[in-house]
Amino acid sequence: MSDAKAWAAADDAHRLIAKALAGLVAEDPTIPPHPYLSRHLADHAARGNVLDDAHVPLAVLPWESSKNVRTLLRQAGAGQHQDWLEAWAVIEPFVRDADPDSRLTSLHLAHHAATRRRTPLAGLPAARRGLAGSRITPLWSDWTVPGNVLAVSDILVESLAHTTTSDGRNLLISGDSHGTIRMWETHGVPFGVPLHTYGGAIQHLLPLQADLFVSGGTDGAVRVWDTLRGRLLAEPVRRPRTWVSGLTLHTPADAPQCILVAHSDGRLTALDTATFQPVDTPLPDLDAAPAILTGIGLAETDGMALAIAQGRQVCVWRPGQDVVRTEQHQDEVRAVVDLPVPGRYATCDDSGHIGFWDAATGRRTAAATPSPAGSVIALAALLVDGEQAVVSAGIDHTLRVWNADTGHPIGGALEGHTAPPLALTELPGDSQALVVSAGADKTLRRWKLAGHGSRPARVVRRPVTAAALPSWAIAAPSLLIAVADEAGTALWNAETGRHVRLPAGESTVTAFAWATVCGDPLLLTAHSDAGIRIWSLDAGNGGAPGSRGKLVNHSIPVQAMEAFTDGERTLLATGSGDGSVRLWDLGRQRQLARWDDHMLSVRDIAVLDTEDGALVVSAGADGTVRLWDPATGPSGRPPIHCGQQGVHTVATVPPRHGEAALIASGGEDGTVRLWDAATLRAAGDRFDAGDGPVTALVSFRTPAGRPCLAAAGPSGTIHVWDVTARTHLLRIVTGNPLSTLAIRRTSEPDAEHPVLLAAGTAGVCVFGVHLERY
């Protein structure tokens, strides 16, 4: 190792080392490998051009700690037999401090989703379904995820910039909503320690020469930082009760370069780039409103102009000349960016308009056609395949690329973010055009733009709007999966892989429920037109379900519903955005009751079985959980004020063997709280997911009868807790926001492992859960 000259080529040594180290990895992934293996095996394999599943075995991945497998895969390019490595790269940014069992389980699910999409159970031998140490058995999936996640942030990133240090290192800089600045290697690994301002959000970052950069935030302060040393050098400006609305460099034709700072009251301040002291230089008078700034490069001897946006108006100013105003935008301008062509710049606004302008005349030279849907939040200028281009970030979660000369789109939309991108920057140091975006989904994503206009758009899975599994009580011959997205609704048979489409029309399905009426299995679908449709399942011949009627009374779409038996009747409880809980007799297809006690929308519905009959439990956006008696209406019990900054979801834990019946609520604050159904008091400490709101929640029992809860939300992680022991059992990381959890509970006594469905922006997956090892 110390004398690389002894080898014919440097990669020969790494290839042999990787081969030798791979032989030291135990076949059982539950056995911890030597720390050197987990830290360096993937790197040796990459350097030796043998980065594949044989040289980096599956068993070492749950222990992998180099945190750069996804980067190594990008550098090494496509290889042979990298299925497990690629599956690990998808979830690697999200696993963080998960325990090895959770990592292995997450890897197992990710691998199945990537390699067995829509594969029927009959097509997968039982021997290949299991994996030693995994807590699940994947059964069926329709899951598509982008692989361009560069990094994941705990906090919302609101600003991005890039810089090249004096030693040639290319770095990304991000500023977040909590006032923290982080630096990243261009492959996503953090560089240095976070820098804390202990002030407002960092919304502007401006790299300078000599390894410095400037930040501006909502606390009204401008700060100067040393990039390599990671320390604060100066705070030349602080204006309380204002915020920094713009930062740019400005070089007049006959004066030294300076830093221009704009505050929310329209005041401009010029700072010397060496001393950071205020300098006396001519500046335009602005309205008392937030100003967005960018310096516009002119011809070599003409210095720079300044483009300034305030509200819907943009103007161009040069020292010694009058302000040149452009035509007024339709809506508030969100970003102004300088183009590499002298005297040219681009703007975008909340109407979705993107304009390209000439600074000398104030006239528009081109406009983006067609305009993207919704507001455009940020812009970045760069060369794409030799053409001057602008990348836009839209409220519709996409990035788009535009020719800066014609305004015409280059290629299709770039999809992958699950929330709007908030900031953009070009990524330096690569021969290809690259852009990094920071989204409200708390991910930094890397986009390769070379050849974008000539290659077909990547197929992106539409987010699932509803999904469900039938319970054991539904007379179905095999595992059925109901899935809906914007493209339509389908009923899949996981055993055969076949599916049928529901002729549900153009309205999107917002919720599912399963029921049995007079022995006939039914599927109920709630729609965006506020109606509920009833379908009879033709399980015998695999044909499309037939329509059995429609329930209409809600004024806003139903968000949750649950069917249950009450004596000889089959009832349906529904909760809607109109704030009401309604009760229906499915046999007669008529409404029995309407309860309007929730002040805001009803987000979830559950049913609690008690000795005295079933109770309907509803979770409201007003932060309460309420109980309803199907026979009498309100159960006579007061609402539960959950104190969770809003309740998104609710589940029930029926009593067994002398246990108390419990109600679980999932909140905006990221907690799950348990409530005694009899006393309506808190039952023990809350469970803390620790990674964002809990928006989906189910309860189930293991074959041994242990009550468990599974919770998920926008973080994309499924948390599993033991209710009795109050312990966290498992984290199943998917890397994409989840909106739905459903459970197929087994009959009494529990003789099988429960089956869990998870669905969200990337699709749907179904798996058996095995927790008895704990």
Predicted features, each with a name:
Residues 438, 442-452, 733, 738-774:
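Blade-level signature of beta-propeller repeat domains, shared across WD40, Kelch, NHL, RCC1
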